[in-house]
């Protein structure tokens, strides 16, 4: 309660201050930007061009110049400049981003292997040039040739495309101009960074204009890989977190007169990444024993060896083991790649290092074709958009920064396709007192191969793969999905008085979802005897003597099983291994807002709105009864103030927002032990007791989809800009969030066992509680240092975030994330030698701060992953390092 009183006090104080320094006249003038010297920022959050200071919701807006100076190269970087926004790649894939706005998140991935599929919609959507990017895959590309970028906070359930509960990111690229001209920019920097981008406007006739924008950038990974195997001679020196990106936007605009234009765009992109990885931080030792041995034996290859899926033997770290201790270091070269030995070496390499046997590479190719037509009919403007998007994506996810391969996830989405269309009509009436918008929206998508394959071999098997210690292969690659959405919406703003307006809007959405599921499991090596054992245990396996090949290694025999169960957790026979699921969901959502001009340049507002996210079908779940999840619903309340004023002659812009969100049926993923094909170490069933004692083989943690009943989120956002002098600009922005599950208990469905913590009521939604960013820009003006210069600008930008909120009950304290801050500096020289050329020097992460990306649940990862979140076990804490200090130079030529 205290923080709410403080925040309300801040708002009240700001309004009082504004009243004290503002003109006493009650006459309202809405456009005060020119009077204060502050730039007017135009946004399209309500489907029409408006001053951002006049829109009654929280918005962050940027142009290309601002993004460049703040080093916002991709959507992921928006977390450093926009309050309440947090973006990071999923655990295994650089090309797939989890966008979080106001604590509402996308899934990391249904499988845990990095393939998000079409199972569930995003909580915070991304729209490029009006086209809805429904999937998180492919969002990691470079932002270039940007005209404007807007981040809308809170539910966008009325006007902005598909329903989103957290918010939306809208960005548009530049349209063709009517005169010839353009620019080219080249960049060189650390870690082999090299990039070039540019654009050119080409007027073809008096009414037909073209624009071509191209981008190519490449950078070597900043995490060095030191993997080598002295026994086999294998090695991997591929640095992680590197990328090679290409992109092109080809635009053609026809404008025969002032009332009509049509714009065609072809947006082509390709991305090849060297993959994410993990750095080992430290060892922690618990009290829970591992198969009756010392707890440290829970760490892979600490007390027992194995042969991995590459055929490389890994010997144990310790030679002498009993129920309480593990001693005597193993001198064998085969023990070189045990986890504990690898951990020790990584401490000597430094923070930005790993030893990963196989890189988590990914590659994607993306194409988007769109047409937007605008027609003016006097007081009415009509806009029609149609788009087609297709992409393919492939990759590999292997372990987590480990010097062996015991789980290999391969994914291939060869032919994703989506079609969408939207008609929007804007109008005004009653002498412009009433402004209205109405529209229709359609979207459909399909993916014929919506899954991947997971090869898994337990490190506690204590041997090479055999019919007694089998590899589990799970095949989701034959699954397919199709989703469609239809919506109609209308919204109007009416000026009750010259200084007071009311806005009301409604949207009705109807969603259809279909999935055809044919998941399979293969156990190999296998014999007729081991197959009969499965059958006797009620698992209808089909034996084949055909060898199964993994990474060029042939394993004798295989048992084929269906990876679907009935509602009671019994595996379906191969002859009936299919499930076609159709679901439909529908929901009305609304917006209601009241805004009032207190005085010139100062608006206060109150907005109430609802949001909805469609239910979904998890094609990688095993239990037919647990395949679907209900839709999410949110009820959001926001109050705020937007003010442009002068303080002792200094122009100031201050925007403040407070919000409260009631969140119902939250779609969440929980790591739950999958024991469908698992056995105890002695060959019996993998029971809850055996699992808790660490005595199961062929079990693995699976992400199942659930609906948490209720959560509540309180938060605040602020953005302040001040111009103390004509050569200094100061900006400060930030957010505070207090998100908690208020009712979240669950029982694992049949085929799974209960995790350590099944009651999450009262636990936080994992996000940073505080995020702040500050920017100072100094314009030294025109100078002459032997050659004439235009403006010389120095920009310093600092981002800070608190540690992640997380439920730490099942984790070691070393797995808690930590707060960090990063400082970026940039020096720009414009119009060098009056040639139209600009030059810039930059340095990011000046202090070389060591910082980590957390896991989906807000903690740092641990090895072994199957005990992730199990209290009292032993492990090695890991993290994905954020970039180190990087410097570079950039040159731009305008023509």
Q: Residues of each region from the PLM?
A:
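Outer-membrane beta-barrel translocator/receptor signature
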Residues: 121-123, 135, 142-153, 158-248, ...
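Acidic, small-polar-rich N-terminal luminal/periplasmic segments of exported/outer-membrane proteins
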Residues: 38-178, 639
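Gram-negative outer-membrane beta-barrel transporters
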Residues: 498-502, 655-662, 681-807, 890-892
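Periplasmic-side early beta-strands and strand-to-turn transitions of outer-membrane beta-barrels
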Residues: 178-179, 187, 201-305, 354, ...
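Structural signature of Gram-negative outer-membrane beta-barrels, strongest in the C-terminal barrel
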Residues: 253-255, 425-426, 435-443, 479-661
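Membrane-embedded beta-barrel scaffold of Gram-negative outer-membrane proteins
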Residues: 372, 376-377, 383-387, 392-397, ...
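C-terminal beta-signal and adjacent terminal beta-strands/loops
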Residues: 662, 669, 727, 788, ...
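N-terminal Sec signal peptide and the immediately downstream disordered periplasmic leader
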Residues: 1-80, 369, 685-690, 695
């Amino acid at each position: 309660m205290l923080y709410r009183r403080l925040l309300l006090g801040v708002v009240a104080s700001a309004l009082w201050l504004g009243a004290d320094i503002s003109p006493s006249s009650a006459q309202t003038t809405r456009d005060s930007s020119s009077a204060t010297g502050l730039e007017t920022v135009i946004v399209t959050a309500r489907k029409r061009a408006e001053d951002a200071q006049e829109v009654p919701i929280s918005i962050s807006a940027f142009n290309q110049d601002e993004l460049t100076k703040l080093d916002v190269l991709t959507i992921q970087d928006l977390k450093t400049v926009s309050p309440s926004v947090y973006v990071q790649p999923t655990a295994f894939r650089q090309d797939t981003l989890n966008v979080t706005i106001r604590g509402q998140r996308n899934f990391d991935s249904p499988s845990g292997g990095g393939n998000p599929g079409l199972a569930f919609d995003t909580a915070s959507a991304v729209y490029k040039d009006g086209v809805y990017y429904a999937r998180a895959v492919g969002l990691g590309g470079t932002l270039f040739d940007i005209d404007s970028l807007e981040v809308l906070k809170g539910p966008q359930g009325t006007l902005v495309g598909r329903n989103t509960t957290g918010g939306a990111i809208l960005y548009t690229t530049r349209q063709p101009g009517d005169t010839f001209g353009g620019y080219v920019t080249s960049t060189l920097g650390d870690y082999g960074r090299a990039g070039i981008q540019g654009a050119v406007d080409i007027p073809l006739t008096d009414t037909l204009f073209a624009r071509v924008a191209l981008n190519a950038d490449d950078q070597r990974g900043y995490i060095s890989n030191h993997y080598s195997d002295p026994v086999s001679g294998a090695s991997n020196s591929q640095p992680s977190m590197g990328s090679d990106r290409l992109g092109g936007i080809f635009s053609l605009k026809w404008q025969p007169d002032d009332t009509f234009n049509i714009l065609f765009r072809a947006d082509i992109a390709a991305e090849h990444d060297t993959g994410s990885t993990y750095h080992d931080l430290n060892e922690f030792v618990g009290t829970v024993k591992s198969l009756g041995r010392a707890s440290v034996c829970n760490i892979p290859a600490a007390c027992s060896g194995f042969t991995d899926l590459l055929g490389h033997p890994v010997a144990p770290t310790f030679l002498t083991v009993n129920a309480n201790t593990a001693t005597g270091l193993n001198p064998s070269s085969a023990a070189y790649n045990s986890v504990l030995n690898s951990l020790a070496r990584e401490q000597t390499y430094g923070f930005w290092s790993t030893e990963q046997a196989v890189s988590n590479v990914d590659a994607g190719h993306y194409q988007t074709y769109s047409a937007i037509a605008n027609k003016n009919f006097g007081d009415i403007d009509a806009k029609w958009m149609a788009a087609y998007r297709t992409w393919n994506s492939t990759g590999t996810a292997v372990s987590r920064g480990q010097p062996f391969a015991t789980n290999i996830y391969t994914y291939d989405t060869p032919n994703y396709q989506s079609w969408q269309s939207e008609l929007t009509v804007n109008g005004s009436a009653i002498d412009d007192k009433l402004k209205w918008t109405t529209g229709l929206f359609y979207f459909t998508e399909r993916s014929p191969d919506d899954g991947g394959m997971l090869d898994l071999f337990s490190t506690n098997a204590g041997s090479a793969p055999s019919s007694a210690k089998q590899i589990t292969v799970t095949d989701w690659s034959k699954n397919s999905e199709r989703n469609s959405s239809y919506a109609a919406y209308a919204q109007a703003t009416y000026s009750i008085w010259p200084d007071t307006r009311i806005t009301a809007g409604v949207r009705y959405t109807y969603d259809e979802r279909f999935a055809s599921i044919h998941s399979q499991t293969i156990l190999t090596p296998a014999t007729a005897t081991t197959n009969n054992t499965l059958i006797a245990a009620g698992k209808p396996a089909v034996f084949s003597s055909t060898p199964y090949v993994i990474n060029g290694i042939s394993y004798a025999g295989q048992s084929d099983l269906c990876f679907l169960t009935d509602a009671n957790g019994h595996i379906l026979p191969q002859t009936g291994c299919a499930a076609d699921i159709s679901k439909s969901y529908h929901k009305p959502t609304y917006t209601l807002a009241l805004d009032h001009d207190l005085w010139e340049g100062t608006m206060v507002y109150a907005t109430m709105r609802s949001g909805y996210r469609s239910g979904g079908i998890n094609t990688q779940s095993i239990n037919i009864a647990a395949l679907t999840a209900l839709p999410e619903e949110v009820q959001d309340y926001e109050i705020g103030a937007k003010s442009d004023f002068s303080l002792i002659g200094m122009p100031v812009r201050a925007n403040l927002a407070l919000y409260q969100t009631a969140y119902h049926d939250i779609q969440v993923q929980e790591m739950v032990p999958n024991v469908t094909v698992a056995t105890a170490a002695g060959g019996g069933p993998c029971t809850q007791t055996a699992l808790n004692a660490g005595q199961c083989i062929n079990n693995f943690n699976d992400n199942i989809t659930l609906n948490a009943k209720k959560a509540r989120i309180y938060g605040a956002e602020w953005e302040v800009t001040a111009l103390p002098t004509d050569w200094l600009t100061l900006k400060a922005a930030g957010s505070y969030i207090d998100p908690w599950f208020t009712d979240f208990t669950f029982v694992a469905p049949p085929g799974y066992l209960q995790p350590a913590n099944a009651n999450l009521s009262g636990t936080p939604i994992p996000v940073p509680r505080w995020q702040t960013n500050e920017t100072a820009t100094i314009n030294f003006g025109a100078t002459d240092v032997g050659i004439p210069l235009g403006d010389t600008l120095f920009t310093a930008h600092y981002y800070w975030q608190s540690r992640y909120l997380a439920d730490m009950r099942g984790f070691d304290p070393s797995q808690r994330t930590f707060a960090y801050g990063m400082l970026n500096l940039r020096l720009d020289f414009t119009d060098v030698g009056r040639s139209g050329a600009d030059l810039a020097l930059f340095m990011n992460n000046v202090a070389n701060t060591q910082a980590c990306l957390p896991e989906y649940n807000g903690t740092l990862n641990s090895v072994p992953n199957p005990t992730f979140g199990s209290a009292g076990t032993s492990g090695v804490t890991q993290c994905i390092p954020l970039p180190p200090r990087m410097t570079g130079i950039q040159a731009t030529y305008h023509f």
